[in-house]
UniProtKB/Swiss-Prot annotation:
The keyword Protein biosynthesis does not apply. GO terms for cellular component: extracellular region. It is found in: Secreted. Belongs to the filoviruses glycoprotein family. It comes from the Viruses. This is Super small secreted glycoprotein. Its main location: secreted. Coiled coil: none annotated. Glycans are attached at N41, N205, N239, N258, N269. It comes from Reston ebolavirus (strain Philippines-96) (REBOV). Residues 1-33 form the signal peptide. Keywords: Disulfide bond, Glycoprotein, Secreted, Signal. InterPro entries: GPC_FiloV, GPC_filovir-type_extra_dom.
């Protein structure tokens, strides 16, 4: 029996060292308020995370600032056919909203008005107080029809739709939005002094006009089968002239395309609809800022004549459609 106890007992010197090490760990944990479970357990409770994050870093919620960050900075495709593939309809999922204090200026924003085949609306009206995203270089305004298989339109990648200082998980009808996420920044607490320093700059008068000093260009589209497997998108030049969009493109390309059609008098001269297609040889990604590093070397050798008629618009591939009450003659 004595030998059995000897196996369980620690030598006196080793026991002292082990006890000292245990006390050091306990005192170390109490000194820095770090939960011991963080070493072996990845699922921490909220209180443990608060102790870990907030000590000497966050002393007040006033140090937290919410910022809206746009997705287009990641280099995602921003043309309407590509963007609409990232959105889908779902039923039975309640929408969620969160406010934010500051945001970026967006290159591309979207504004949707989609109806079902029976004439009913696909998208809900925005709640009271919700306004469109205020800083957009291009607003892609899309009107059309679709099956809309669900109650609300969500982002398939889990991102938010950014409105004016409000982010929502759903798209609201006729309200301009940008795609993005919400980030929370922890600002260092300013040191308190007993005297008040003189401000470095005089206060600047602000305005409630969210569109001041920022030029916004609206591009219009017509879309059919929105929310379906295969959708069709037309760029609207005027009420009777359209361009079929079959490839990813940039808003700058559409602006130049619009100018080319008008400058060369290629608009519909009747009450019928005239639809053009773009020559496949033309690169539609001119001016894309997200790919500037890969494209900037090509600009000095690119001839802008490629965007002039007839190279950018192929008259032999044009699609002519007649609307009721008028014929659309072929352009020469």
């Amino acid at each position: 029996m004595g030998s059995g106890y000897q196996l369980l007992q620690l030598p006196r010197e080793r026991f002292r060292k082990t006890s000292f090490l245990v006390w050091v760990i306990i005192l170390f944990q109490r000194a820095i308020s770090m939960p011991l479970g963080i070493v072996t357990n990845s699922t921490l409770k909220a209180t443990e995370i608060d102790q870990l994050v907030c000590r000497d870093k966050l002393s007040s919620t006033s140090q937290l600032k919410s910022v809206g960050l746009n997705l287009e900075g990641n280099g995602i495709a921003t043309d309407v056919p590509s963007a609409t593939k990232r959105w889908g309809f779902r039923s039975g999922v309640p929408p969620k909203v969160v406010s934010y204090e500051a945001g970026e200026w967006a290159e591309n924003c979207y504004n949707l008005e989609i109806k079902k085949s029976d004439g009913s609306e696909c998208l809900p009206l925005p709640p009271d107080g919700v306004r469109g995203f205020p800083r957009c270089r291009y607003v892609h305004k899309v009107q059309g029809t679709g099956p809309c298989p669900g109650d609300l339109a969500f982002h398939k990648n889990g991102a938010f739709f950014l409105y004016d200082r409000l982010a929502s998980t759903v798209i609201y009808r006729g309200t301009t939005f940008a795609e993005g996420v919400i980030a929370f920044l922890i600002l260092s607490e300013p040191k308190k002094h007993f005297w008040k320093a003189t401000p470095a700059h005089e206060p600047v008068n602000t305005t409630d006009d969210s569109t001041s000093y920022y030029m916004t260009l609206t591009l219009s589209y017509e879309m059919s089968n929105f929310g379906g497997e295969e959708s069709n998108t037309l760029f609207k030049v005027d009420n009777h002239t359209y361009v079929q969009l079959d490839r990813p493109h940039t808003p700058q390309f559409l602006v130049q395309l619009n100018e080319t059609l008008r400058r060369n008098n290629r608009l519909s001269n009747s009450t019928g609809r005239l639809t053009w297609t773009v020559d496949p040889k033309i690169e539609p990604d001119v001016g894309e800022w997200a790919f500037w590093e890969t494209k900037k070397k090509l600009f000095p050798t690119t001839s802008w004549r490629k965007l002039a008629f007839p190279n950018s618009i192929n008259p032999h591939q044009q699609l002519l459609r007649s609307e009721p009450g008028g014929n659309c003659p072929r352009k020469n």
